[in-house]
Amino acid sequence: SFTDDPSFVAIHRNLPVPKYTVQNKNATVVISTARMKLKYKKGQGPFTKDNLTITSAKGMFPFQWTPGTIQKGNLKGTDRTLDGFEGDHNIYSHQDMKLEDGLLSTDGWTLIDDSKNFLFDNSEWAWVKAREHKDGQDWYFMAYGHDYKAALKDFTVFAGKVPLPPRYAFGYWWSRYWSYSDKEMRQLVDNFHTYNIPLDVLVVDMDWHYTDPGFGGWTGWTWNRRLFPNPAKFLGYLKSNDLKITLNLHPADGVAPYEEKYPEMAQWMGVDTAKQERIPWVVSDKRFINGMFNKVLRPMEKQGVDFWWLDWQQWMYDKKVDSLSNTWWINYVFFSDMERNRDTRPMLYHRWGGLGNHRYQIGFSGDAVISWKSLEFQPYFTNCASNVLYGYWSHDIGGHMFKGGDKEILDPELFTRWMQYGALTPVMRTHSTKNSVLNKELWNFKGDYFEALRNSILFRYQLAPYIYTMARETYDNGISICRPMYYDYPEAKEAYDFKSEYMFGDQILVAPITTPMQNGLSTVKVWLPEGNDWFEWTTGTLLKGGQIIERSFTLTEYPVYVKAGSVLPLYNRVKNLNSNSEEIIVNIFPGENGSFTFYEDNGNDKYYANEYARTRMYTERKENHLTVTVGPRQGKYRNMPTDRQFKIKVLGSAIPETITINGNRAEYEYIGDELALLITIPQTACDQEKTIEIQYSTSIPELNDGIVSQFKRFSKAITALKYRDAGIVLTPAMGATEATSIALTYSPERFNELIETFKRNYSQMPEMLKEQKLNEANSQWFMKAIGWKK
């Protein structure tokens, strides 16, 4: 007999029924939908290759399947952890990683065999139960062709949605395995403020509890008062700084007699305290788990602990329920407890437990080796995880530990490139093992390294409104923010070949830098899909789609490509993501007409499924006229701001002749080093439409040819040149060229003249350097520094 009880994978059994037809013949029954046709021979018993056939419907990607058919093109899912891995190779087992199969395949179909999986019972807090009929068949067959996005959304229909994390999860997390004290943590936070570096989450590793014999160990549940003499006041200090905190847990050793909460737990479990016996960790024991939450963890949550970091150290399988994965089950238990007992959104950070764990959000990928190989592998690993909806991997940015035999030096270039990539991952969190050389605090770096590292965090916060909108898409449709290229370009061979390249949401393409620089530049081969042009954000270059191209980047540049014409809502400078009323900078990228629907909600309540708001922003271009519209906000949620400050930022923009806002003439600022027009809309009610009309002249020089990068590289090279020759006096041409971007800001009315002069001077750079009378070595160095090409 078939069971309709929810399983670990399929939590929804009562599903919407698609349109279908049935042909009921004497020997067979045929069920047809728009995507497939199922044919079964009656009276033949369990499904086998002899009695069941599923074929694609007309017009669909062709396939024929019978039980036992092996997929040839599975696009893979993820793995439990990166512990001990350098790239895809484990330095301890000397085995290469074999990613689990995912939900998607180039074959166009997937079978999920759920027959052996555990079920949930129907108790008030649903609990694990084994299947009564061990030989039953519980299958889900998905036919999707190459419509991968449809497959993922369909999976959420029966397997559940990916919960929307609280907004603060998309800020910067500071984490380090280090025996921090209360005072050191305060100094750390002060330094973040001093250097104007945003911060949302502080992670405290296992030294929050006692770790020495007789007091603690890997497992611990009692605050170490040598380091934190007053935990409540420490947590209160963090709250006063709008910070969230998570504590590390290694739960495997249960509750020892030396723990503060041991007497309460012993009484709860009926253990004789006189025997001083350890209370074992058994996650399947509902009474034990209720005691752990109510007696041990809940008091700390009430003090101010926001969520828990479930680190590895529990046994692979439960001690009482045979074959029950401790990782899978502990993730469910902790997350569902937060669902049941908190007013705020549940969030957990943990290792992957298997299919169905997408319902418990944030992943902790573990202890990866510090190396370029590890950085090179992580984009592919992260992208593939979206194929099982595990779209929120949190990596130890910069790597966790050195490999035995490696020189223990923190390579600033490797860390910088990892941080730049980390800013464009689901969760931005630095971490490392307890090693005195792994000082990843940004203020330990100098010059371009500090600039690039700090800018990576600032860029992350700029992107927060876009990222949060994409997180809502993950909840609605099952599409992760970091997704392989084949989701959008399933018929392009390059979408499968360029494994590290990915879409970061709907509008942004990222081609990570995963190798060291040569002669001060990183060269990356980038595939730009056809269908639209692409704006290389960091250099201000508009590139044609439908090509594979090599591009070079300095340390402070990174290959991020925005679909031409995109409209992206961004933040300016923010302290963190605690506030819900920050001004929005609506960025308009060069290209054709574009639009974006900005999403907002309370940020941390549990009512986001129905309580939220959206604002549509769009552009219309006609010859030399640009219209930008910020539509009226639709929807509502708790504590929603009634009005908001908007600014319009037009990238690659010339100087306008006129600007109006809702028919009234308006002023503007010009940002010379970005070639960007900035228009401030007076703060108005969010439910009012705002229309900005921008009229340009008919004579506009080419602006999206990389001149922004030329400005920046030239200025940096001039600054560095002064340290090579402190007595240098710049010629008028060299001085004017270096000052172009600031001159544009000061004197935008000279726009055409300044741009034309810069381009002329830049094209004549060898002659300018001769006029400057630089020696041969400095001339060659300068040309390389600016990346000059004829």
Where do the protein language model's features map onto the residues?
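Solvent-exposed beta-strand/loop surfaces of large extracellular or lumenal domains
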Residues: 5-19, 271-272, 536-555, 658-682
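Aromatic- and carboxylate-enriched substrate-binding clefts and catalytic-loop regions
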Residues: 8-10, 64, 198-453, 488-490, ...
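Catalytic and substrate-binding clefts that recognize carbohydrates or anionic sugar/phosphate headgroups
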Residues: 12-166, 176-177, 182, 189-194, ...
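Conserved, mostly hydrophobic/aromatic
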Residues: 35, 102, 192, 238, ...
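An acidic-aromatic substrate-binding cleft motif
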Residues: 151-179, 199, 718-728, 732
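Catalytic core of carbohydrate-active enzymes
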Residues: 335, 340, 355-363, 377, ...
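Accessory, solvent-exposed terminal regions and/or long lumenal/extracellular loops of proteins
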Residues: 560-665, 672-674, 678-689, 693-789
